Amino acid sequence: MRNTLLKLILGGIGAFMMCPVNAQVDEFSSWTGVKVSYGITSRLKASGHLEFRSKDNFKEADRLGMTLGLNYKMNSWLRMEGSYEFHYRNVSGRPWKARHRYKVGATGSVAWNEVKFSLRELFQETFFRGEVENRLRSRLKVSYEPEKWLVKPYYSTELYQPIGDDAFFTAARIRYRPGVVIAFSKQYALDVFYCRQYEPKGSRNIVGLEFQLSF
């Protein structure tokens, strides 16, 4: 059963990776980050995240980011969360600019044997250069998490929808993300992933590493 489930997940990832891309010129980027989580109580956790992103085929810095957040476990299947983000962005041809963002949302999850399914809904509001942008983010994720395995694969799809205008039923952004979490111990892990990001103006191929610490 384990081998069958693993083949299904990896097969789906492989099929996605082999899909033909559109005719737009794609850009390659990288995301590198460190995330620290701390359990305040058995239900409440605080987290901090530092991240660096590149763009233009790894030639330019895109942004530096910091996130502070809280999440609360309501019950065995529902978790609430909220966070604040600060970005220092490289606006090509202009001075770097600061951007502020907050997010609130919830994640519901269920497990079947060692396969975990989750659906996350987030409201996101961003303040940048005197403008406000609102988005609804919907992410569906499936992961295979055998307790004794060091490497645990996952795949997620996330949809960004505009809020506050007639374009709600359009996709401002879609992210397809296969990856693996390498669990060195209960406290230390490394998330290695590829993300295909689609936007109407163009697409990005993103490779990422995130070091995770839990206390």
Please provide the spans of the model-predicted regions.
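Bacterial Sec-dependent N-terminal signal peptides
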Residues: M1-F28, F215
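Residues on the lipid-exposed face of transmembrane beta-strands in outer-membrane beta-barrel proteins
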Residues: V34-Y38, L68-Y72, V104-V110, S138-Y144, ...
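Outer-membrane beta-barrel domain signature
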Residues: N22-V25, S54-K59, V91-K97, F127-E131, ...
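Repeated loop/turn-to-beta-strand initiation elements of outer-membrane beta-barrel proteins
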Residues: S42-G48, W77-G82, N113-F117, K148-P153, ...
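Start-of-domain marker
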Residues: Q24-E81
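Transmembrane beta-strands of outer-membrane beta-barrel pores
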Residues: L50-D56, Y84-N90, V110-E114, F123-F127, ...
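Residues that define the transmembrane beta-barrel architecture of outer-membrane proteins
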Residues: F28-S30, D62-L64, A98-Y102, V132-L136, ...
